[in-house]
Swiss-Prot record:
F-type ATPases have 2 components, CF(1) - the catalytic core - and CF(0) - the membrane proton channel. CF(1) has five subunits: alpha(3), beta(3), gamma(1), delta(1), epsilon(1). CF(0) has three main subunits: a(1), b(2) and c(9-12). The alpha and beta chains form an alternating ring which encloses part of the gamma chain. CF(1) is attached to CF(0) by a central stalk formed by the gamma and epsilon chains, while a peripheral stalk is formed by the delta and b chains. The keyword Lipoprotein does not apply. It holds the Pfam family ATP-synt_ab. It catalyses: ATP + H2O + 4 H(+)(in) = ADP + phosphate + 5 H(+)(out). GO terms for molecular function: ATP binding; ATP hydrolysis activity; proton-transporting ATP synthase activity, rotational mechanism. Keywords: ATP synthesis, ATP-binding, Cell inner membrane, Cell membrane, CF(1), Hydrogen ion transport, Ion transport, Membrane, Nucleotide-binding, Translocase, Transport. ATP binds at G152, G153, A154, G155, V156, G157, K158, T159. This is ATP synthase subunit beta. It is a peripheral membrane protein. It is found in: Cell inner membrane. CDD domains: ATP-synt_F1_beta_C, ATP-synt_F1_beta_N, F1-ATPase_beta_CD.
Amino acid sequence: MSTGTVVQVIGAVVDVEFPQDAVPQVYDALKITGEGSCNGLVLEVQQQLGGGVVRTIAMGTSDGLRRGLEVVNSGSPISVPVGTATLGRIMNVLGEPIDEAGAIGEEERYVIHRSAPSYEDQSNTTELLETGIKVIDLVCPFAKGGKVGLFGGAGVGKTVNMMELINNIAKAHSGLSVFAGVGERTREGNDFYYEMKDSGVLDKVAMVYGQMNEPPGNRLRVALTGLTMAEKFRDEGRDVLLFVDNIYRYTLAGTEVSALLGRMPSAVGYQPTLAEEMGVLQERITSTKTGSITSVQAVYVPADDLTDPSPATTFAHLDATVVLSRQIASLGIYPAVDPLDSTSRQLDPLVVGQEHYDVANGVQTVLQRYKELKDIIAILGMDELSDDDKMTVSRARKIERFLSQPFHVAEVFTGSPGKYVSLKDTIRGFKGILSGEFDHIPEQAFYMVGSIDEAVEKANKKK
């Protein structure tokens, strides 16, 4: 346990001098001791500058920090509580409780910097995970133990979609979940807590928050804290769900830290180590022969530009991508998932079966044709189309509306009860629309319903 002193403070970056023979290693956690508001503040070593000086990032506010304060080296990276004691609790990046419900009472702590499982230990299964959301189950099905990205600009429903997935999967799958709130709004974290409490699944969720108002160090490391807790459950042989909201803020925190450390920025001002930082996190989110981690990550898309380096780097790591479109949201169709832009490696006849594959393909073909015809309709009107094209447009409009669905977590806003639709019902409904079985039903009947039976019932009521 060597001690050093603070020699320079620049915002969240703190330089600490140690004796030459006891310099801390990179990623070691240091603790400020002594009087004042900064007592107990944790610093993480980022660089060794030579001459016994290390450059660190503060894991908390550096207000009141001054030169000359004593710093103690813990001799190991930041460690956080793991295991069942974390369930139902809200913690910060250091694993300290922030829900005013007393100590965590953990039996074990893990360090947050760990290596990814080796090739031999990783497993590759293709078991499907039913979400109960029609558009996702049909067009971009999730794999158990896979990685899913929810891509979308500001305000198109990433968090609501994620909350619905947690609600549906946590109830149906009754597994354990870890939720990492990375640089998001505190209000959303609060909503999430009460949502879980009301639906009775709070005792199955561990929550780790490093929100928007916190220093960049917290936001950069909080995803690793959540992941470490998920890894412990996986290593115990459980199937765990990891939700990260929002992975873009993780990148952004890395950009801030990189700039504070004086590194030269790369494309669009991002850190030069963007791909490596993303890889360090994503490579650890994997399933082993003992247990699985299924992860759902919300990805904010700056200015709706999917070619921005941050979302583009994230794409490479995912098995399924759910793209939320502002255009679809503006039509009032929620969830605003773009069925032509969303993809999944699982959408393969060998995995999902021939029927599912054909129906999904048919839906995409009809919607693509409708997209091409929109220009003609805008210029010449519907009357100029051939009978086949008129039928395609009619079915496409029904499919578009049938892709909408009332959510459980949005009941307060929509006023209509949420619906969980099984994969069997989803395929049956879309297959019927494609085959012309429901050509006699008006398109309004397909809007905001669960299964196809509800659409038929709605149409009969309107008669």
